[in-house]
């Protein structure tokens, strides 16, 4: 669905339906005077008498077909004092889905309404971004492998237009809507990659996706293979890919617009295990098919770069994606094996299903040596322990830099990504002691998410601003909503985009 703009006031507006957002106990006919001018039948539409504007309620009001706006799709927001950006996103998604069900080709939203529905701490521009993003996410479907199409399946609307009162579209409104469009595109990219089957979405496939983004947007892309990684000394990463038939890749993608080449980059490292059997420490069969989503960290970074390509922000950003399968094989790493990491530290691998931290530790060392980053953020579906602690809607945030941690948590909350701070207690590092090596890759069952984060902490140089995001819970969902039909969620794409666009606060 395209995002468009119509200026010139109600006399110039044309749409098959207009979505309006209504608070409980506020009359529908008073939502916007310009809309009432364009659709005067709205004040007497019978369906309007029954509409109570409860949260998630959607009503369709039909007018005479001769009018330029023959339908109004009213979406309830509930009580004004309870309104949040998340509720606005959900309302936009619910409204556009109803428009799709009605087979409406062109949909409008009155721009002047956006400021009046903004929660106290936000403005019309933020609401415009959320409405556009929510509407686009509401139309997301993953059905590319269905060969038999449903004849009743409605097509998406062709466009959503913001309807403006003045002669021109304000530049800031245009920018806000385009930002919402860009981040929704990025989340769609991440969702597609997580939802894709592991026989298609291989490390080589992720590399080809990165290269396609590079060609389209001018990003610099490098791809390193198995032999190069081994010769570089990435023994921990190699211990994971040793048993896999699909060849591993380390993907580097860089956004460096003119004038930013000398900046210290913001570096994101994303776990890219395209299928995780657990290796020799084999997982149970139940739900193993969901382990195709164990590359959600890498997918989020590719989604970020897809969004950056649409907005071209003046900031240097690097993505590092260590990608492999974790498979059992005659060559696979055995529990008890000892490997030497890129940092020179040795690790005793007690459990081959704790593989994410092994490829991440080498990637983190590589990133620090090569770029001396302004800040270093890794994200990974790392531990089931984090899901046990926080559930499926909240990610774990491990960071001993208060300013960086606050930036991630606050910006994430604004855009619908929830993070909760968890500790990096130094005493827990005792859990990672090995009798035969510098470190063990696992500790006791208790505090599993903290132990994993502390393992990564051993590979962060002094003075480096670092955060670890354990996104195992919210990266994939079985729960359907107006914003997501289930499966990959695109979690963290928007948070990363906000960190790039707003910058990292000083420590």
Curated annotation (Swiss-Prot):
It is an enzyme of class 3 (hydrolase). Pfam families: Peptidase_M17 (PF00883), Peptidase_M17_N (PF02789). Its cofactor is Mn(2+). GO terms for cellular component: cytoplasm. GO terms for molecular function: manganese ion binding; metalloaminopeptidase activity. The active site is at 283, 357. Its EC number is 3.4.11.1, 3.4.11.10. Belongs to the peptidase M17 family. Presumably involved in the processing and regular turnover of intracellular proteins. Catalyzes the removal of unsubstituted N-terminal amino acids from various peptides. This is Probable cytosol aminopeptidase. The gene is pepA.
């Amino acid at each position: 669905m395209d995002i468009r703009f119509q200026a010139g006031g109600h006399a110039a507006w044309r749409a098959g339906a207009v979505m309006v957002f209504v608070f409980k106990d506020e009359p529908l006919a008073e939502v916007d005077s310009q809309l009432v001018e364009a659709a005067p039948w709205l004040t007497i539409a019978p369906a309007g008498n029954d509409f109570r504007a409860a949260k998630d309620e959607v009503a369709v009001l039909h007018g005479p077909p001769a009018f330029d706006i023959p339908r109004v799709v009213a979406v309830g927001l509930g009580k004004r004092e309870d309104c949040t950006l998340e509720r606005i996103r959900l309302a936009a998604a619910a409204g556009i889905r109803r428009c799709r069900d009605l087979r409406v080709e062109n949909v409008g939203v009155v721009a002047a309404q956006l400021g009046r529905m903004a929660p106290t701490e936000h403005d019309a521009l933020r609401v415009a971004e959320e409405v556009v993003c929510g509407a686009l996410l509401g139309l997301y479907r993953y059905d590319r492998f269905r060969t038999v199409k449903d004849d009743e399946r409605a097509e998406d609307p062709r466009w959503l237009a913001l309807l403006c009162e003045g002669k021109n579209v304000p530049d800031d409104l245009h920018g806000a809507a385009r930002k919402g469009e860009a981040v929704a595109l990025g989340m769609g990219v991440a969702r597609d990659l997580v939802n894709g089957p592991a026989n298609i979405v291989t490390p080589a496939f992720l590399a080809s996706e990165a290269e396609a983004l590079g060609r389209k947007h001018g990003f610099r892309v490098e791809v390193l293979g198995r032999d190069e990684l081994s010769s570089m000394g990435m023994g921990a990463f190699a211990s994971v890919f040793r048993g896999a038939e699909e060849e591993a890749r380390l993907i580097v993608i860089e956004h460096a617009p003119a004038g930013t080449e000398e900046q210290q980059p913001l570096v994101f490292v994303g776990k890219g295990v395209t299928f995780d059997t657990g290796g020799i420490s084999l997982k149970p069969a139940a739900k193993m098919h969901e382990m195709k989503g164990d590359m959600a960290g890498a997918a989020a970074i590719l989604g970020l770069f897809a969004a950056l390509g649409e907005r071209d922000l003046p900031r240097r950003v690097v993505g590092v994606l260590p990608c492999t399968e974790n498979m059992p094989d005659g060559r696979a790493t055995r529990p008890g094996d000892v490997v030497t990491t890129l940092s020179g530290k040795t690790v005793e691998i007690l459990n081959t299903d704790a593989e994410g931290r092994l490829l991440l530790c080498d990637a983190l060392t590589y990133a620090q040596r090569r770029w001396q980053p302004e800040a270093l953020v890794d994200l990974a579906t790392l531990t089931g322990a984090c899901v046990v602690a926080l559930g499926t809607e909240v990610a774990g945030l491990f960071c001993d830099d208060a300013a960086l941690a606050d930036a991630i948590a606050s910006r994430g909350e604004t855009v619908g990504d929830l993070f909760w701070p968890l500790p990096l207690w130094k005493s827990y590092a005792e859990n990672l002691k090995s009798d035969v090596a510098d470190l063990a890759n696992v500790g006791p069952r208790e505090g599993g998410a903290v132990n994993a984060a502390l393992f990564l902490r051993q590979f962060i140089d002094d003075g480096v601003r670092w955060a670890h995001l354990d996104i195992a819970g919210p990266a994939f969902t079985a729960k359907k909503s107006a914003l997501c039909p289930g499966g990959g969620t695109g979690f963290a794409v928007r948070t990363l985009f906000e960190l790039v666009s707003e910058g990292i606060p000083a420590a």
